[in-house]
């Protein structure tokens, strides 16, 4: 995969080199470049200007963004604008982006964008209903979530398949040594060696956690008959079963 990031602050992305992104680069699975679009600004290196019609703040000018993207060698890239008004980013979105060969991210850092920039864009993405100072943190988050899904980046293919949200449910609780820590012990079922019992326990715990913390995920979840019965059992235990 090839990723190009347009930003006024390339140095902000240094931590990515020490994460899964760095490992992907070492394996030759990722080629990533950072472009300071101030270098392409024609008007005394100014990348922002006042909005026509008046208003608060400054807008990112179209010219530096157009010129930067036009010098990037890419065939059919997905061009992503980080914007609070964009489509919410999800695990499913990350899985979709991981199938692409080329991604370009545009990180803003002002009140907004000249609307004409959006004629270049294929995706407008938001991390949630809040506003960040710039798009860099959002871009780093999306890049990390996407790159780890590229085949062979993680040690085992199942590593990300068991993550929260990959299955549509939150991940079940996990434990490691010691068995007893300050009186808190590992559930006996995990010590049993009985694979089917462990599978059922993990599924039930995933359903329980999702029901209690993110019930909205269950509204669009495609339940198997087994999962539906387990959820009914959970609701009954909580005194919330159907009449």
UniProtKB/Swiss-Prot annotation:
Binding annotation for S-adenosyl-L-methionine: 108, 127-132
Give the EC number(s) under which this enzyme is classified.
2.1.1.228
Which processes are annotated in GO (biological process)?
tRNA N1-guanine methylation
- Catalytic activity annotation: guanosine(37) in tRNA + S-adenosyl-L-methionine = N(1)-methylguanosine(37) in tRNA + S-adenosyl-L-homocysteine + H(+)
Q: Output the Gene Ontology cellular-component terms.
A: cytosol
Compartment annotation? Cytoplasm
Principal place of residence: cytoplasm
Q: Which Gene3D superfamilies match?
A: 3.40.1280.10, tRNA(m1g37)methyltransferase, domain 2
Q: Which CDD domains match?
A: TrmD-like
Instruction: List where this protein forms a coiled coil.
Output: none
Supply one GO molecular-function term: tRNA (guanine(37)-N1)-methyltransferase activity
Instruction: Please tell me which top-level EC class this enzyme sits in.
Output: transferase
In terms of NCBIfam families, this protein maps to: PRK00026.1 (NF000648), trmD (TIGR00088)
Which protein family is named in the record? Belongs to the RNA methyltransferase TrmD family.
Give the quaternary structure: Homodimer.
Functional summary from the UniProt entry: Specifically methylates guanosine-37 in various tRNAs.
Q: Which HAMAP family match?
A: TrmD
The protein's name in its UniProt record: tRNA (guanine-N(1)-)-methyltransferase
């Amino acid at each position: 995969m090839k990723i190009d990031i347009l930003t006024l602050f390339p140095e902000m992305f240094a931590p990515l080199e020490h994460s899964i992104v760095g490992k992907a680069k070492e394996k030759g699975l990722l080629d990533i470049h950072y472009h300071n679009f101030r270098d392409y600004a024609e008007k005394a290196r100014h990348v922002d200007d006042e909005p026509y019609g008046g208003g608060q703040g400054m807008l990112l000018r179209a010219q530096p963004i157009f010129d930067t993207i036009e010098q990037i060698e890419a065939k059919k890239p997905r061009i992503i604008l980080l914007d609070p008004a964009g489509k919410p980013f999800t695990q499913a979105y990350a899985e979709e982006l991981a199938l692409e060969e080329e991604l370009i991210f545009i990180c803003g850092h002002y009140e907004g964008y000249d609307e004409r920039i959006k004629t270049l864009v294929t995706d407008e993405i938001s991390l949630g209903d809040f506003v960040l100072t710039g798009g860099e943190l959002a871009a780093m988050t999306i890049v990390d979530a996407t790159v780890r899904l590229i085949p062979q980046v993680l040690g085992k293919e199942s590593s990300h398949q068991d993550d929260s949200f990959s299955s549509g449910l939150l991940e079940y609780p996990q434990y490691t040594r010691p068995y007893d820590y300050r009186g808190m012990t590992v559930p006996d079922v995990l010590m049993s060696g009985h694979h089917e019992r462990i599978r059922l326990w993990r599924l039930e715990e995933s359903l329980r956690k999702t029901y209690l913390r993110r019930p909205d995920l269950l509204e669009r979840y495609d339940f198997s008959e087994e999962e539906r019965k387990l959820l009914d059992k959970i609701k009954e235990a909580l005194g919330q079963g159907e009449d």
